[in-house]
């Protein structure tokens, strides 16, 4: 099974399944001399882990990460960093009734078509549980980018169902269980989640992720454009069905005179491009949005077939998120950080001696 590695110089390889013994990852390309402890990774893992509020899955996983290699006396050595998180709250019996049934909207059917078999326990490798290791790896990238270059990466929920959320106050994002920057909408979000729980249904969401203080020049035309790699990384997150960079699909309704980001002596006058021009960072804030589908793990009955071609009624049991967009916030930050870290190392490897007299804003 290929496709488990992301990045070229900063390379993250993950392994493990939802109901396996553990999840793990190997991270190559981490510069030596970075102060690093398990506590540095745990903060973001705690933001992602299940069972932290009544709005997310009640699977209780502590997600305690262990650093197995690549750190000596509290600093990175420059060698491969190995990380491990044990699974401790699996309930595989919850899935025994569906081992021969293809859950609609899930990867059951496609995994079995591809491999001829599948791990039906919680989706196996296709489960979003795998993203815990991405968050751990992303925490390393976030720390390096912040300490060495002042790059700050943040994400928040900006829509749930038909409830739009304005980015009013980033300080409020970590103060509520929805990662919402709009505290005026918290009551509406709570009411929606209560209604979904009563109905046994789920809802989609939009998450916005931004990166500030990114230097100009990151990105490798033409096939490794920065926006292409960011979109690739974000699209790989479970349940993501769409990615926008900057204005995204909104550019369809704009004229060229409206969409172009004019430049004056004071700098760019707008940021419809989302901080990336020609696949290369401009020095502006990088902005991306992701659309996440409503999970298909719901108790509303639906039709499907089993492995024998028989039509059956499907009701998904187990512990699931009514809105996967909530816990996608730290995952989106991690994927943005991994891509920026990789491109920063690649840029420095080739262009470390490049200097220009162009202004930077």
From Swiss-Prot:
Keywords: Amino-acid biosynthesis, Aromatic amino acid biosynthesis, FAD, Flavoprotein, FMN, Lyase, NADP. NADP(+) binds at residues 48, 54. FMN binds at residues 125-127, 238-239, 278, 293-297, 319. Its EC number is 4.2.3.5. The keyword Heme does not apply. GO terms for molecular function: chorismate synthase activity; FMN binding. GO terms for cellular component: cytosol. Pfam families: Chorismate_synt. Reduced FMN (FMNH(2)). NCBIfam families: aroC, PRK05382.1. PANTHER family: CHORISMATE SYNTHASE. Homotetramer. This reaction introduces a second double bond into the aromatic ring system. This is Chorismate synthase. The gene is aroC.
């Amino acid at each position: 099974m290929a496709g488990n590695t992301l990045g070229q110089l900063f390379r993250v390889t993950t392994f493990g399944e939802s109901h396996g013994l553990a999840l793990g990852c190997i991270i190559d390309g981490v510069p030596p001399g970075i102060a690093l402890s398990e506590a540095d990774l745990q903060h973001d893992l705690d933001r992602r882990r299940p069972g932290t509020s009544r709005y997310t899955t009640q699977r209780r996983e502590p997600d305690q990460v262990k650093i197995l290699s690549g750190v000596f006396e509290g600093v990175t050595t420059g060698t491969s960093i190995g990380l491990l998180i044990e699974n401790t709250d699996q309930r595989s019996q919850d899935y025994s009734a569906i081992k021969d049934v293809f859950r609609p909207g899930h990867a059951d059917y496609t995994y079995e078509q591809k491999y001829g078999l599948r791990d039906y326990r919680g989706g196996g490798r296709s489960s979003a549980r795998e993203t815990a290791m991405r968050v751990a790896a992303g925490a390393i990238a976030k720390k390096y980018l912040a300490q060495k270059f002042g790059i700050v990466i943040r994400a928040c929920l900006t829509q749930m169902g038909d409830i739009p959320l304005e980015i009013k106050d980033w300080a409020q994002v970590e103060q509520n269980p929805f990662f919402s920057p709009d505290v005026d909408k918290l009551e509406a979000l709570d009411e929606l989640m209560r209604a979904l729980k009563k109905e046994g249904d789920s809802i989609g969401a939009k998450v916005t992720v931004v990166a500030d203080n990114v230097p100009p020049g990151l990105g490798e035309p033409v096939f490794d454009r920065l926006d292409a790699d960011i979109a690739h990384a974000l699209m790989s997150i479970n349940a993501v069905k769409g990615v926008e960079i900057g204005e995204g699909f909104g550019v369809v309704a704009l004229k060229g005179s409206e969409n172009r980001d004019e430049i004056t002596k004071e700098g760019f006058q707008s940021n419809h491009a989302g901080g990336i021009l020609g696949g290369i960072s401009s020095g502006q804030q990088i902005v991306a949005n992701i659309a996440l589908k409503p999970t298909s793990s719901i108790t509303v009955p639906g039709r499907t077939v089993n492995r024998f071609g028989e039509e059956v009624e499907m009701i998904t049991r187990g512990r699931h998120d009514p809105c996967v967009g909530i816990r996608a916030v730290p995952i989106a930050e991690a994927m943005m950080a991994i891509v920026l870290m990789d491109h920063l190392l690649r840029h420095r490897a080739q262009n470390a001696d490049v200097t220009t007299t162009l202004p930077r804003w």
